[in-house]
Curated annotation (Swiss-Prot):
It comes from Arabidopsis thaliana (Mouse-ear cress). [4Fe-4S] cluster 1 binds at residues 85, 89, 92. Residues 69-290 form the Radical SAM core domain. This is GTP 3',8-cyclase, mitochondrial. The gene is CNX2. Its main location: mitochondrion. GTP binds at residues 78, 128, 159, 220, 322-324. Expressed in all organs, with an abundant expression in the roots.
């Protein structure tokens, strides 16, 4: 298999946009020698991640509830606000739809804020709102306002399909929304309708432009690559970064209940990178943050950037700092793990903050070192993505 490799030119542990890893490509019979072995590379990562954790603890002392048995510090909470969505994306929701949790069983606004406050007081500094589609929740503006007011929270983000975002974004920004990711898997309107089973491509493009006009930089665009569906648009997506502050994020197709995952649909990172390198040979690897899930790149002359999220072929479990609170109040420590624990039930039974912290901490301590291989993941019972929120 043709692979693209990286050579470290600056091992500075601090994150700076000017620190790059040069990219070479193995194409055809030619090859590029990897300058750092996998073992050495893993040691460098482990060392930088450990150093990052020490800095984090010094800057913001955390409770033990956020540290798992492998020493990973979890400072990033993803909150699913709803299971409802105004699209029916093929990789996210089964064609027949999903059974929605009755509204009384979903977390209320006050419950979301209380639980989020527990995490932030313990050391979480970033919260991302997901769904379903988070913007279909009527009280999203008030939720953003209350969450952004939590002392210690540094970043409030949202992942959205962009269908209704353009008209809501000005107010969401006023309510403290710091950053956003917009999901878009094709630049072709007809293909958009096929992939999402709905119309609305023009509205998503408008939302991207609105975000740029409001000063969001970068505006992150999530693109799930699926063989035979949109892998012919990879370089077209990269072109979006030429004149606009857009960070295009190519995501490997992941298996979840109901999305008919097939390894043949998976376009691995190395293959995507080969296509990009051939078209944009000046692409350069940026120095990534120790807990970054993406491999980040810039291209000479481009205003934006390109990233790759390699959950299937090159997982990033060693530096995982993410936790998930689902719309029904279940707490999930791994995107690909089936294990969940309810925080809603003890909350509604009158549990105090200390009791809730104990439940959270115990779940975090049970987190595994890494998720299973992609073929095993495909066989594991898990929720549809629409229920998890990514």
């Amino acid at each position: 298999m043709r692979r693209c490799f990286s050579k470290i030119t600056d091992c500075h542990l601090g994150f700076k946009n000017s620190n790059f890893l040069l990219v070479g490509s193995e194409v055809g019979s030619g090859s590029v020698t990897r300058t750092i072995t996998t073992t050495t590379s893993e040691r460098l990562f482990s060392s930088s991640y450990a150093a990052h954790q020490v800095d984090q603890i010094k800057d913001n002392p955390v409770s033990d509830m956020l540290i798992d048995k492998f020493g990973r510090l979890h400072t990033y909470l993803r909150i699913s606000l709803t299971e409802r969505c105004n699209l029916r994306c093929q990789y996210c929701m089964p064609s027949e739809g999903v059974e929605l949790t009755p509204k009384p069983q979903l977390l209320s606004q006050s419950e979301i804020v209380r639980l989020a406050g527990l995490f932030v007081s313990a050391g979480v500094n970033k919260i991302r709102l997901t769904g379903g589609e988070p913007t279909v929740r009527k009280d999203i503006e008030e939720i953003c306002l209350q969450l952004s007011s939590l002392k210690g929270l540094k970043n409030l983000a949202i992942t959205t399909n962009g269908i209704t975002l353009a008209k809501k974004l000005p107010r969401l920004k006023e309510c403290g929304l710091d950053s956003l990711n917009i999901s878009l898997d094709t630049l072709v309107p007809a293909k958009f309708e096929f992939l999402t089973r709905r119309k609305g491509h023009d509205r998503v493009m408008k939302s991207i432009d609105t975000a740029i006009e409001l000063g969001y930089n970068p505006v992150k665009v999530n693109c799930v690559i699926m063989r035979g569906l949109n892998d012919d648009e990879i370089c077209d997506f990269v072109e979006l970064t030429r004149d606009k502050p857009i960070n295009v994020r190519f995501i490997e197709f992941m298996p979840f209940d109901g999305n008919v995952w097939n390894v043949k649909k998976l376009v691995p990172y190395a293959e995507v990178m080969d296509k990009v390198v051939k078209r944009f040979p000046s692409i350069k690897r940026m120095q990534d943050h120790p807990t970054e899930t993406a491999k980040n790149f810039t291209i000479d002359g481009h205003c934006g950037s390109v990233s790759f999220i390699t959950s299937m072929t090159e997982h990033f479990c060693a530096g995982c700092n993410r936790l998930r609170l689902l719309a029904d109040g279940n707490f999930k420590v791994c995107l690909f793990g089936p294990s969940e624990v309810s925080l809603r039930d003890p909350l509604r039974s009158g549990a105090d903050d200390e009791a809730l912290r104990e439940i959270i901490g115990a779940a975090v301590k049970r987190k595994k070192a890494a998720h299973a291989g992609m073929l095993d993941i495909a066989k594991t019972a898990n929720r549809p993505m629409i229920h998890i929120g990514g």
